[in-house]
Design a protein with these regions (language model features):
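Single conserved hydrophobic/aromatic residue that forms the stacking wall/gate
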Residues: 1-9, 13
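Conserved GNAT-fold acetyl-CoA-binding loop/helix
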Residues: 21-44
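A short helix-loop-beta-strand connector motif used in the catalytic cores of GNAT acetyltransferases and
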Residues: 42-54, 71
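Conserved beta-hairpin
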Residues: 51-63
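A short, internal acetyl-CoA/4′-phosphopantetheine-binding micro-motif in the GNAT/acyltransferase core
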Residues: 71-82, 105-106
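Conserved GNAT acetyl-CoA-binding A-motif
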Residues: 96-108
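Conserved acetyl-CoA-binding loop of GNAT-fold acetyltransferases
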Residues: 117-126
Length: 143
């Protein structure tokens, strides 16, 4: 059976929050403290607008992604499990099974930009501000 499962946020919400925090603290070092706290507070709202899929290893949720209308809206891997191919498995599943063709990435998150380029995404547009109007430039990428 696949380690990728559709999951309602409420079932594993606490664990998703832990994963988000672990991932963001280790990949988004450009975030101001108050913005980190703002996004953390907004997570429940973001979760309501996506279909969530989790990746389990030995029964433990170690990563998840959120999909909406062909867009990969979020992909977070617990920092202890990064670099072993889980993100690639999730995004491959999304492309092959969920018709995902687009992703928006923080330009300052070099690891993520490199990851998506490696998968085959290319930047087609850039925004100076993120979706919340904050000064974190976004690269709009597509396959």
């Amino acid at each position: 059976s696949t380690p990728i499962k559709s999951s309602a946020a409420s079932d594993v919400y606490k664990r998703q929050m832990e994963i988000w925090e672990s991932a963001v603290l280790n990949t988004h070092d450009f975030l101001k403290e108050e913005d980190f706290l703002y996004y953390k507070e907004q997570l429940p709202v973001y979760f309501q607008h996506v279909t969530l899929f989790g990746f389990e290893q030995e029964g433990i949720l170690v990563g998840f992604m959120g999909i909406a209308k062909g867009n990969l809206e979020m992909l977070f891997i617990d920092n202890n499990y990064r670099g072993i191919g889980i993100g690639k498995k999730l995004i491959t599943y999304a492309i092959d099974n969920l018709q995902v063709t687009k992703v928006d990435v923080n330009e300052q998150n070099n690891q993520a930009v490199g990851f998506y380029k490696h998968i085959g995404f290319n930047t087609y547009k850039r925004s100076d501000l993120d979706g919340e109007g904050k000064e974190y430039p976004i690269l709009h990428m597509r396959l």
